[in-house]
Amino acid sequence: MAAGLDRDKALDNALAQIDKAFGKGSVMRLGDDTRPPIQAIPTGSIALDVALGIGGLPKGRVIEIYGPESSGKTTVALHAVANAQAAGGIAAFIDAEHALDPEYAGKLGVDIDNLLVSQPDTGEQALEIADMLVRSGALDIIVIDSVAALVPRAEIEGEMGDSHVGLQARLMSQALRKMTAALANSGTTAIFINQLREKIGVMFGSPETTTGGKALKFYASVRLDVRRIETLKDGTEAVGNRTRVKVVKNKVAPPFRTAEFDIVYGGGISREGSLIDMGVEHGIIRKSGAWYTYDGDQLGQGKENARSFLRDNPDLANEIEKKIKEKLGILPSVESDAVAPVPIDL
């Protein structure tokens, strides 16, 4: 008994010294109710929010969004930016590809007047800017578009044909080592958009891989595989894509869930389309033939008419979204009073 008391006293002394040296909360018991649940930033698609398990992208974590060209990667990221800004948050966009379209971003709901944008010359500059913004503690979300465009300084200053094996992978590994703890402490969500490449000589399994080495795969709490599966047409004219997203890694909820939603050209993710799909799937919206009804009221004949009706009646759309989230037990998304930095475990 005496030995046990001595151990407890020694532990208390050690914890007191650690708190004095490194600040209160440097070491804590997991059972201590000192931290709130993980907050989430909505993605703009109720189906994807449900697949992620917590109602959106987790705050204070590293997110990787990858897929083929024109699959909707940047669109998903910009919707998250728009939702973070709508809740009163501050957002930044590191445009390493020099391809950000402000007009399109504005149509998705991004407040382009207050969006912090950087178009860096080198990968080192891009990641240093991102690290400094995160460490300011004022940021809610930052997007790096894309990992493949983070070209090391040595490669830019060298000549065409020079070999620079592993430079980008080492750069990403170093940056993520520095940024991960800062992201958790500041409650900033970092979204890395990535491209696909094919490994040569793969006989079995998928030859696809992402750029930038393996560090991002390890540090990411959530990895989203975005694929275009169908073209949406109005008559013969293509008006959008049907998109499937697979949550291939998830540290905050069960992984390997999939979500499907519509991306309309010039308008981004169709929130109303996702509400109709999820509402029908879970019995909140009734589909009879081509007609969609909710609580006995007709929404429209055909999905496009029902979508237009919900777009014109946002209160009804919000009510349907709330019922879907309540039925599925999804945590509430980030609200305007919840954008302050929240320490989150890694």
Curated annotation (Swiss-Prot):
Keywords: ATP-binding, Cytoplasm, DNA damage, DNA recombination, DNA repair, DNA-binding, Nucleotide-binding, SOS response
InterPro entries in alphabetical order: AAA+_ATPase, DNA_recomb/repair_RecA, DNA_recomb/repair_RecA_CS, P-loop_NTPase, RecA-like_C, RecA-like_N, RecA_ATP-bd, RecA_C_sf
Annotated binding of ATP, by residue: 67-74
SUPFAM superfamilies named in the record: P-loop containing nucleoside triphosphate hydrolases, RecA protein, C-terminal domain
CDD domains the record matches: RecA (cd00983)
SMART domains in UniProt: AAA
Gene3D superfamilies: P-loop containing nucleotide triphosphate hydrolases (3.40.50.300)
One Pfam family per UniProt: RecA_C
Single annotated GO MF: single-stranded DNA binding
GO cellular component, one term: cytosol
One record GO biological process: DNA recombination
Entry keyword Zinc-finger: no
PANTHER family in UniProt: MITOCHONDRIAL DNA REPAIR PROTEIN RECA HOMOLOG-RELATED, RECA
NCBIfam families linked: tigrfam_recA (TIGR02012)
Its job: Can catalyze the hydrolysis of ATP in the presence of single-stranded DNA, the ATP-dependent uptake of single-stranded DNA by duplex DNA, and the ATP-dependent hybridization of homologous single-stranded DNAs. It interacts with LexA causing its activation and leading to its autocatalytic cleavage.
Protein family according to the UniProt entry: Belongs to the RecA family.
Protein name: Protein RecA
Gene source species: Frankia alni (strain DSM 45986 / CECT 9034 / ACN14a)
Source lineage: Bacteria, Bacillati, Actinomycetota, Actinomycetes, Frankiales
Gene: recA
